[in-house]
Amino acid sequence: MTLKEFIIPAIDIKGGKVVRLYKGEFDKVKVYNENPIDMAKYFEDAGAEHIHVVDLDGALEGLPKNIKILESIVRSVNIPIEFGGGLRSFEAVKAVLDLGVERVVIGSLAYQNPEEFYKIVESFPNKVIVGIDAKDGKVAIKGWTEKTEVSPLEFAKKYDDLDIFGFLFTDVSRDGSMIGANVEATVELAKNLKHPVIASGGVGSLEDVIKLYEKREFGIFGVVVGKAIYEGKIDLKEI
């Protein structure tokens, strides 16, 4: 896997626009682009192998809210899209996969309704990424607004034997901060799981990406990068 393949550029959508939150706080929003579809095309042209799309409105409301935009993104590019945000029912997941999304990220539902989650994984093998959002070493749900008492590893172990694609581990306290990814926690998680782990949160430079890339033998599949690209700290075309 090349370094470029390891990077999964992110498009976070709120109110129909491309935004980034700071540390998962919905009142700390910065708009980077008015058009998510243009952004997706840019990433494809820059050589991205896949794109990570998040419906922030959906994450907050518990139901995908930017479906039309998602559909347009899927139609506009020829690279796989992974999507998360508000996928809290079988119907919502099916609708998104029917649009042509490659993989779905599910977090809150896996925690709150394991039965429904098992049904989804059974129906869509290898299509589900379990989203693990961590705040102060514990899993956070409902768009990061609610903290549980469960550790990321404890949470992940419940699903590691299922036919999932892997896990997405986000350190919410670093998300949008560009202070560097939590390499240690990501490696610790990946080492103890059978399925691959995608890292997310805090990447501020190509050096941060390389630190994770060098640990890929432990089961790290890639890293989601958002703000560092939008702020010009990482240029996909140059990699």
UniProtKB/Swiss-Prot annotation:
Tell me the InterPro entries matching this sequence: Aldolase_TIM, His_biosynth, HisA_bact_arch, Isoase_HisA-like, Isoase_HisA-like_bact, RibuloseP-bd_barrel
Q: Where is the signal peptide?
A: none
Active-site positions, per UniProt?
A: 12 (proton acceptor), 133 (proton donor)
**Pfam families recorded:** His_biosynth
Q: Which GO terms describe its biological process?
A: L-histidine biosynthetic process; L-tryptophan biosynthetic process
State its Enzyme Commission number(s): 5.3.1.16
Q: Which GO terms describe its molecular function?
A: 1-(5-phosphoribosyl)-5-[(5-phosphoribosylamino)methylideneamino]imidazole-4-carboxamide isomerase activity
Pathway(s) this gene product operates in, as recorded in its UniProt entry: Amino-acid biosynthesis; L-histidine biosynthesis; L-histidine from 5-phospho-alpha-D-ribose 1-diphosphate: step 4/9
Where, per UniProt, does this protein localize?
A: Cytoplasm
User: Which terms are listed as keywords in the entry?
Assistant: Amino-acid biosynthesis, Cytoplasm, Histidine biosynthesis, Isomerase
- Similarity annotation: Belongs to the HisA/HisF family.
Catalyzed reaction equations: 1-(5-phospho-beta-D-ribosyl)-5-[(5-phospho-beta-D-ribosylamino)methylideneamino]imidazole-4-carboxamide = 5-[(5-phospho-1-deoxy-D-ribulos-1-ylimino)methylamino]-1-(5-phospho-beta-D-ribosyl)imidazole-4-carboxamide
The record's Gene Ontology cellular component field reads: cytoplasm
Q: What name has this protein been given in UniProt?
A: 1-(5-phosphoribosyl)-5-[(5-phosphoribosylamino)methylideneamino] imidazole-4-carboxamide isomerase
